[in-house]
């Protein structure tokens, strides 16, 4: 018998490694990759090594002060957006905290300032871990763990 955690259509999660806490996220089974709002990403050299300097906005701070993170491990990938346009985006690996557990996640960096949710969790992350119940919300944030068994 197998079981997966039930997740709602939206939630609130933490990205502790990059100090972004209590971010509202949309669970998006239509998106393959997960993405996060990043208003600026710049490649920099530190001691001769290329790194990616990212400028995130943290909605937890009422003044929306900059959250700057430098990634050693990053890449670019081609992503097709919901409007069908392909673009190259930076991609980073970090951890997301949901249901009291840390999960590895790959996030593409996108300009989502005009979107309701700064973070989308896509199928690549969700598969084999979660089942979506669109009638529910904030199950992880409220620490309500339900299982779907099959």
Residue ranges and their predicted role:
Residues 1-150:
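Pepsin/retropepsin-fold aspartyl endopeptidases
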């Amino acid at each position: 018998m197998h079981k997966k955690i039930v997740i709602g259509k939206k939630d609130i999660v933490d990205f502790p490694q990059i100090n972004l806490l209590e971010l509202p996220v949309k669970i998006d089974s239509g998106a393959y990759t997960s993405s996060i709002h990043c208003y600026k990403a710049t490649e920099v050299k530190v001691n001769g090594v290329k790194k990616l300097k990212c400028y995130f906005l943290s909605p937890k701070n009422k003044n929306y002060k900059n959250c700057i993170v430098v990634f050693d491990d990053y890449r670019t990938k081609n992503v097709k957006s919901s409007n069908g346009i392909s673009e190259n985006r930076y991609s980073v690996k970090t951890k997301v905290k949901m249901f009291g557990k840390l999960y590895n996640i790959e996030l593409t960096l996108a300009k989502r300032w005009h979107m309701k949710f700064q973070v989308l969790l896509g199928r690549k992350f969700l598969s084999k871990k979660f089942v979506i119940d669109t009638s529910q919300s904030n199950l992880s944030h409220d620490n309500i763990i339900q299982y779907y068994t099959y």
